[in-house]
Amino acid sequence: MLIEIPNVFSKEEVNQLREQLDARTWIDGNQTSGVMASTRKRNQQLDKDDPVALQIGELIMARLLAHPLFVSAALPLQFYPPLFNRYQGGETFGYHIDNAIRSTSEGMVRTDLSATLFLSEPDTYQGGELVIQDTYGQQSIKLAAGSLVLYPSTSLHQVTPVTSGERTAAFMWLQSMVRDEGQRRLLFQLDQSIQSLTAQAAPEQELFNLTGVYHNLLRRWSEL
């Protein structure tokens, strides 16, 4: 399941974030790569311990945890804190699958979901599409600055070469309360249906019943 979430940050907020990020020191992006991925990756990143990157990462996580669509789709349990990358001058990241486990200062994170928050407007660079292969085929993603795409970490994906301009983004992984992607999809569809019926003032008893089904399935499938 691939979900696009528009306007996580406003244009003005993105501009403020970019001013801070652009002023930092960017390094070789292979510090987060596995052995296989490192042969396909050419980009730049901020150091994971950069204080500005850490501060903005906290802001991103807080914003996402307060976003109803993100919470409904991801059922987040634990984040691997956001990192920041930049592509320019032909830089690219060939097809790869993200590492299954990431280590943080607080322990291990199983990467159930990957997310990219775009921080460059699509008309300011050529190339740089996030191409994701999933059960519905190949999808090419290039969103407006401030918008985010969320997708299963099991997906084969790449960032195509940036042939002009500059593509800056935040990327992150998270462990979901529900490990299985198919179960997460069913819960998301059910939750979205409940919200839609609520907005349509559906009969109260039917909403109670559906909400009960949702929570009982979540109770059955969640791992905490």
UniProtKB/Swiss-Prot annotation:
<keyword id="KW-0223">Dioxygenase</keyword>
<dbReference type="GO" id="GO:0031418">
    <property type="term" value="F:L-ascorbic acid binding"/>
</dbReference>
<dbReference type="InterPro" id="IPR006620">
    <property type="entry name" value="Pro_4_hyd_alph"/>
</dbReference>
<keyword id="KW-0560">Oxidoreductase</keyword>
<dbReference type="GO" id="GO:0006879">
    <property type="term" value="P:intracellular iron ion homeostasis"/>
</dbReference>
<dbReference type="Pfam" id="PF18331">
    <property type="entry name" value="PKHD_C"/>
</dbReference>
<dbReference type="InterPro" id="IPR041097">
    <property type="entry name" value="PKHD_C"/>
</dbReference>
<dbReference type="GO" id="GO:0005506">
    <property type="term" value="F:iron ion binding"/>
</dbReference>
<feature type="binding site">
    <location>
        <position position="167"/>
    </location>
    <ligand>
        <name>2-oxoglutarate</name>
    </ligand>
</feature>
<feature type="domain" description="Fe2OG dioxygenase">
    <location>
        <begin position="78"/>
        <end position="176"/>
    </location>
</feature>
<dbReference type="GO" id="GO:0016706">
    <property type="term" value="F:2-oxoglutarate-dependent dioxygenase activity"/>
</dbReference>
<dbReference type="GO" id="GO:0006974">
    <property type="term" value="P:DNA damage response"/>
</dbReference>
<dbReference type="InterPro" id="IPR005123">
    <property type="entry name" value="Oxoglu/Fe-dep_dioxygenase_dom"/>
</dbReference>
<dbReference type="Pfam" id="PF13640">
    <property type="entry name" value="2OG-FeII_Oxy_3"/>
</dbReference>
<keyword id="KW-0847">Vitamin C</keyword>
<feature type="binding site">
    <location>
        <position position="157"/>
    </location>
    <ligand>
        <name>Fe cation</name>
    </ligand>
</feature>
<keyword id="KW-0408">Iron</keyword>
<keyword id="KW-0479">Metal-binding</keyword>
<protein>
    <recommendedName>
        <fullName>PKHD-type hydroxylase Shewana3_0717</fullName>
        <ecNumber>1.14.11.-</ecNumber>
    </recommendedName>
</protein>
<feature type="binding site">
    <location>
        <position position="98"/>
    </location>
    <ligand>
        <name>Fe cation</name>
    </ligand>
</feature>
<dbReference type="InterPro" id="IPR044862">
    <property type="entry name" value="Pro_4_hyd_alph_FE2OG_OXY"/>
</dbReference>
<feature type="binding site">
    <location>
        <position position="96"/>
    </location>
    <ligand>
        <name>Fe cation</name>
    </ligand>
</feature>
<dbReference type="InterPro" id="IPR023550">
    <property type="entry name" value="PKHD_hydroxylase"/>
</dbReference>
